[in-house]
Amino acid sequence: MKFIDSDLQDYIGTNFSVSKNNQGITEMTFLNGTSLFNKTNYAKIMLGQCTDCDYLYKGFFEGFIYDKVLIAGLGFGLIPQTLSEVNNCSKIDVVEIDQEVIDYNISSGHLNSDIVIIKSDIFEYTTNEKYDLIIIDTIWDESEMTDEDYGLLESRLLPNINTGGALYVPI
């Protein structure tokens, strides 16, 4: 799924900007030059539901049932919105470090009310909640996460995964 581009506000901020590109697709561009696009395949790829994608992106979670999900990284909120509207998950928590990204999404009003946004760094976040699936959507390139970083995330988050659940770090 994707959002209706006209429903997403243009924005120029301190850490990122949001605008429509030449094709009318909304784009969130961060200071480091990384861009997110409001496209249907983004959440499908991240959730292994892309039927017309390269084989690397198909069926990640085939046969895996999840209902309670924690996502690190908000962006436009395509993943949590898909989990809410398409997958009908009962619990969707999102940890986002950037208050500006949180404020943009709240003021834009395009996310469902069942999505809980938590201001925190995923490397410092603690909770007693248990999840079926934890998705780390904060990394754009494998060089951005060291083995030490992964080990830290794994040791912090594995206690929060239900039996049979998964930690998904797509790098």
Q: What role is predicted for each listed range?
A:
Residues 2-11, 51-171:
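The AdoMet/dcAdoMet-binding core of the Class I SAM-like
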Residues 1-66:
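Class I S-adenosylmethionine
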